[in-house]
Amino acid sequence: MEDVISLSRYFVENDTTIVDIGCSTGKLTKAMIEYNQDHCNNASWIGVEIADGFVDDLKKRYEEITKKDKTIDVEFIMEDIRDFEFEECSLVTSIFTLQFMPKKDRKEVISNIYRGLHDGGAFIFSEKTICENALVQDMITFNYYDYKRKTFTTEDIMDKERTLRHMMKPNTWEEISDMLCEAGFSNIQPFWRNHAFVGAIAIK
């Protein structure tokens, strides 16, 4: 998340909108506001979340932000990102969110993001990916399990795996890159990788 916050400074502009897709508790949104407030105090910040379980957290986060500075234009909305209209955006972020969407819906959302960005605006995102080669996929998966066992029990790991198995719809990096290109992005660059996870930036 620190990379996303620091990269945001290159794109956030006054009189534009910044959208945080799948904002959950609003932690990233708040951090980006604070990081950019010294040079950009007239932007609109929108956190979009679909899960009702975050309503109370987002109310508290809104109060935290506006208590410090009532002039900050920020809102958290409960909405399916597939129905959201991106307008006048300088930056859109998505941290491990689009990977839960079917490919068709993901392509449509990425196209909507591209159309809603200013020229020079950016889409910064992170996703879990899968490998094209089954052997490499197994190696990365088991290596990740070994890493997780340092903190969690095997039972905890497998319970989470079973929970996410039918919810997550990961793609290969090549498929993700193709979706971005089809939407119109021509400048696409990964900036972070860890096991099967990747963070990348796509600039319009």
Question: Residues of each region from the PLM?
Answer:
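Conserved beta-strand signature within the Rossmann-like core of class I S-adenosyl-L-methionine
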Residues: 120-128
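A short glycine-rich, Lys/Arg-flanked "PGG" loop and its adjoining helix->strand segment in the class I
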Residues: 107-119
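Short conserved loop adjoining the S-adenosyl-L-methionine
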Residues: 83-87
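A conserved beta-strand element that flanks and buttresses the S-adenosyl-L-methionine
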Residues: 93
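Core SAM-dependent methyltransferase catalytic element
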Residues: 186-204
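Conserved alpha-helix/loop element of class I SAM-dependent methyltransferases that forms part
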Residues: 1-14
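C-terminal alpha-helical "lid/dimerization" subdomain adjacent to the S-adenosyl-L-methionine
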Residues: 128-182
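Class I SAM-dependent methyltransferase SAM/SAH-binding core
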Residues: 19, 24-82
